[in-house]
Amino acid sequence: MEIFKKASSIIETLKQQGHEAYFVGGSVRDLIIDRPIGDIDIATSALPEEVMGIFPRHVPVGLEHGTVIVVENGEPYEVTTFRTESEYEDFRRPSSVQFVRSLEEDLKRRDFTMNAIAMTEEGEMVDLFAGQEAIQKREIVTVGNAADRFQEDALRMMRGIRFVSTLGFSLETKTKQAIETYGHLLEHIAIERITVEFEKLLTGTYCVKGLKELVETKLFSHLPYLQMSEERLLKATQYNWDSFETDIEAWAFFLYCIGEEHPSVFLRQWKFSNKKIKDIVAVLLTIRKRKEKDWDTVLLYKTGIHIAEMSERVYEAMIESYDNTSVKRVQTLFEALPIKSRQEMNVTGNDLLNWANKKPGPWVAEMIQNIEEAIVQGNVVNEKECIREWLQECNLL
């Protein structure tokens, strides 16, 4: 409760001014489940203008949605006015938001009962939709009619399966049936929003369970490049996903499991950044090389430790070996390299020009590369005079 105590003064101040205020959302859910708590959110009957008038230190980040960031004890907290939403447009966003003075009206618009629990500053739960019962049963249940909730915002279906992966809960029967019925509405949702949820699914503690639900609800058939991937997705559930430490590894392994032959095309379709695409593809290419031969100094040097570690963890998952000794071996090999990057070489292009007494040209870059590989392979010591002598012995000067 310590994390909530730091924000309690906000609720107390709002109440002193005649308003209602409660902790709400994921932080309350995670407190009940006894999971690490992230951002603390507060809901209040005070209008945004009233919140800003009460708290001098604020940032008006989302006034149209009723959200003001209040800075208290050096920490930022989202304070949002109780609100209800009108008819939704395109199965993803409300056409308008109305501020209300009722906590119940605010909670009833939320996605799942476990996320619709409010808490007073004293720690008393306000549970109007049996959210605690759902948590006790480890079930994901929509607030009210599941069909209505998913037709309001189709992304909620993806969020539901993401929660299966992150919490290990199961979809309640009617909720699951509604996902099967309304899954096609996911095609109205921007792929960027789907990608965020899918990544949380892949990196969840119960990823295998989440992937199984993705198949059982047929939701996968409404996702880009996955329409025909049922058998391959089921194959993915046969592996252990626990060894991955980054989202890059999870995506690389996922692409391996579904047999994606054009990973760059897939990732661009899912709107990944160029940097992330580059890293994921680098891991997959490194694994291809790794299958052909074990690590040697040149391969490890050219790959770099970051990609090498990730590649090894994914490769270990592929061959179903999870003792982590191979990753440690890669780290040991890398630490033993004479140089870790070209910047550590004790020779420059100018040195070569002076020694060879030749005009600049492509030969300089080629010779630098030859020297670099020789240093990495241990054929020459990374000292200027040693490099010069080695070049002379090899008749390269």
From Swiss-Prot:
It is an enzyme of class 2 (transferase). Gene3D superfamilies: 1.10.110.30, 1.10.246.80, 1.20.58.560, Beta Polymerase, domain 2. Its EC number is 2.7.7.72. ATP binds at residues 26, 29, 110, 153, 156, 159, 162. A single active site specifically recognizes both ATP and CTP and is responsible for their addition. Belongs to the tRNA nucleotidyltransferase/poly(A) polymerase family. Bacterial CCA-adding enzyme type 3 subfamily. This is CCA-adding enzyme. It comes from Bacillus cereus (strain 03BB102). The lineage of its organism: Bacteria, Bacillati, Bacillota, Bacilli, Bacillales.
